[in-house]
């Protein structure tokens, strides 16, 4: 089923690129909501399904009513959950686990991203950069492991959105690679796994260590954004220090405790991840 849904999502993404009809776009929004419901129905995440359905369909109707103009652009940003319009995400992710969470943070956003590209407003770069600043402040005050990962994923997706307007090919390549990484990391967020996701691999990846996927997302985006506004982007780089302090919360727990039962991981998967990080430079 997951293979069929993945292929169906790729088909909807291709369809959204080939057409600029608002009715077709709205139909894609509706079908992606159905996909989300199908994926999370088996885990009985009814609260998250209800919240997601109400939010997405309300915004979908507004998208139809407000045909043309900047309002449609902001509605798409809100539907995707791009910072600083990501405040509703936690109402959905609280009861989502395992691959449902992975799908929500990655592939679920792919058709929306291609539609956003077609109605992009150039001055929104400043809004996206401000959203990154909000993410860094939120990461600094977060104390939940799961919320830390969700905010970090939202922040990385903001960099992807910024990058797609400058280099679409590089961004889609990084998005697919980011998706593969999240498949291996977020699969630990299950109801029965406890804190298995608290490990050195997860922490180091989200600390933006060199050759990690989030590191490349930021480097490729920064190389283009510096041409647009160097001062504000440089200021953002200094504020990234807040995220390092926040993820040190993980580092302290990992250093002070020897949780052998919570350090189990798919070790072979990580032997695959890190060589791929180096290959992605090429």
Curated annotation (Swiss-Prot):
Subcellular location: Mitochondrion inner membrane
Catalytic activity annotation: a ubiquinone + NADH + 5 H(+)(in) = a ubiquinol + NAD(+) + 4 H(+)(out)
One record GO biological process: mitochondrial electron transport, NADH to ubiquinone
GO MF: NADH dehydrogenase (ubiquinone) activity
Primary location: mitochondrion
Any GO CC annotation of this UniProt entry: respiratory chain complex I
Alphabetical UniProt keywords: Electron transport, Membrane, Mitochondrion, Mitochondrion inner membrane, NAD, Respiratory chain, Translocase, Transmembrane, Transmembrane helix, Transport, Ubiquinone
Its membrane topology: Multi-pass membrane protein
Residues spanning the membrane: 17-37, 58-78, 87-107, 115-135, 166-186, 202-222, 232-252
Annotated EC: 7.1.1.2
Lineage top rank: taxon: Eukaryota
First-level EC class: translocase
Family statement drawn from the similarity comment of this UniProt entry: Belongs to the complex I subunit 2 family.
Function noted in UniProt: Core subunit of the mitochondrial membrane respiratory chain NADH dehydrogenase (Complex I) that is believed to belong to the minimal assembly required for catalysis. Complex I functions in the transfer of electrons from NADH to the respiratory chain. The immediate electron acceptor for the enzyme is believed to be ubiquinone.
Name under which the protein is recorded: NADH-ubiquinone oxidoreductase chain 2
Gene designation per UniProt: nduo-2
